[in-house]
A protein has these predicted regions:
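Positively charged, low-complexity intrinsically disordered leader regions
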Residues: 1-76, 80
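Phosphate/diphosphate ligand-binding glycine-rich loop within oxidoreductases
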Residues: 56-177, 335
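A short helix->loop->beta-strand "cap" motif at the edges of active sites that frequently abuts
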Residues: 147-154, 220, 319-328
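Short, conserved loop/helix-junction motifs that constitute active-site signature segments
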Residues: 185-187, 216, 315-324, 352
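Rossmann-like adenosine-cofactor binding region
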Residues: 242-346
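Adenosine-phosphate binding glycine-rich loop
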Residues: 320-397
Length: 397
């Protein structure tokens, strides 16, 4: 049976000092030790909550959330993570702010950050915009701190941008690590990141990009599968190739869903929009070309409709490793006969993995909390020990 000291010992064996007072943009910005520290600390925080030990490292402070796209799981995961550490969450509704009246990013970032310790941002809809916006926010609060406007520089956590979805993908990895009995057991395991049909269009590229950008770090055999014309960002493909070479894993692209599923230990069938089309959409929005946007939407819907056979079926699942591959999804999935007529996954497959999917999602609040804590505590291992010795109950019995 594990004790808190087991997690503390693991943390003490890792080098993650550069995460202190730093931000989290992309998983491939971080070292292997830094990624492992997040998983270890996430497990430690979960252990403490399950044992009714308060993990509040803040007596006051704000966690600011900015969501430029719809969210349920990530929104509540960020709020849960902040609450777990003692921060109060304040969501910035840009429609109700002065941004519509010409307030600059620098001004907004500083005005919301006087007592903020963390800012979580989701900005995933437009290629070339989300990651850039997050960087601009960080540059703004960094300068505000240097100029003495802010008492502290809030840490940024990327809650999804146009390039990566790190909190989601780190939660996937945490789930896989637990299911496979340890990080070292992921080496050589096959994961299929495959496109799947959806009756909608424009789903973000950051999920498949985040998966191939992270899982190739872990020595896994990563297969990216999609119909021709559904390519992801070339820069992220290059990252995946380099990661695989360094980790001893592998990375390849196929246009055959069955090839990807064959003998896979983990499958992740999900729809996404073609990179080239999303670049075009960004340019059309920038030009205010509504007719062009409408035409592109119809073009993409017609393109999707040609690939309705790209679906996670019982037949395909039988071809995976022992017919029992792990099935991942960020949710909500497009389920045949439930949320749509034709979609990403057959209802019987989804129903069989429902509990596993919910369990997978439960790792995200702890992953986000770990990211925040590593950025705000100079010695997280010592902080864990102090929290244990303090002995404050999370909930009175």
């Amino acid at each position: 049976m594990k004790t808190l000291q087991d997690y503390i010992d693991k943390l003490n064996a890792l080098n993650f000092k550069d995460m202190y007072e730093n931000d989290f943009f992309l998983t491939w910005d971080k070292t292997d030790d830094e990624l492992e520290a997040i998983w270890v600390l996430a497990d430690a925080l979960r252990f403490m909550r399950e044992h009714n030990i308060s993990t509040k490292i803040f007596e006051s402070g704000l966690g600011i959330s900015i969501f430029r796209d719809n969210s349920t799981r990530t929104r509540f995961s960020f709020a849960s993570a902040c609450n777990l550490l003692g921060l109060q969450v304040q969501d910035l509704d840009e429609k109700k702010s002065q941004i519509a009246h010409g307030e600059t990013v620098r001004e907004t970032a500083n005005m919301i950050s006087f007592m903020a310790d963390v800012i979580g941002i989701r900005d995933d809809m437009y290629i070339g915009k989300g990651h850039t916006y997050q960087k601009e926010v960080v540059d703004s609060v960094t300068q505000g701190y240097k100029d003495g406007i802010l008492e502290q520089k809030p840490t940024l956590v990327n809650l999804q941008c146009d390039i990566d979805h790190p909190t989601q993908c780190m939660a996937y990895a945490a789930h896989i690590i637990h299911e496979m009995g340890g990080l070292e057991n992921l080496k050589g395991k096959k994961i299929a990141m495959t496109w799947a049909y959806s009756p909608s269009y424009g789903k973000p590229l950051s999920v498949p990009q985040g998966v191939i950008g992270l899982m190739t770090r872990l020595g896994m055999d990563v297969v990216l599968s999609h119909p021709e014309g559904y390519e992801v960002m070339p820069d992220v493909v290059d990252v995946a190739k380099k990661n695989a070479e360094k980790s001893g894993g592998s990375f390849r692209i196929t246009h055959d869903m069955a090839d990807a599923f064959k003998d896979a230990d983990v499958v992740y069938p999900k729809s996404w929009a073609p990179f080239a089309a999303m670049e075009k959409r960004t340019n059309l929005y920038a030009a205010g070309d509504q007719a062009g946007i409408d035409a592109l939407e119809q073009e993409l819907l017609a393109q999707n409709a040609q690939h309705k056979d790209w679906c996670c079926t019982e037949e395909l699942m039988k071809t995976t490793k022992d017919g029992k591959a792990m099935y991942l999804h960020c949710l909500p999935a497009d389920i045949n006969g439930v949320s749509c007529e034709d979609g990403e996954v057959e209802a019987s497959v989804f129903d069989r993995y429902r509990d596993s999917l919910y369990k997978e999602a439960s790792y995200k609040p702890y992953v986000i909390a770990a990211m925040i804590m590593l950025a705000k505590c100079q010695d997280p291992a010592q902080t864990l020990k102090a929290l244990e010795e303090r002995g404050i109950l999370r909930k009175m019995k």
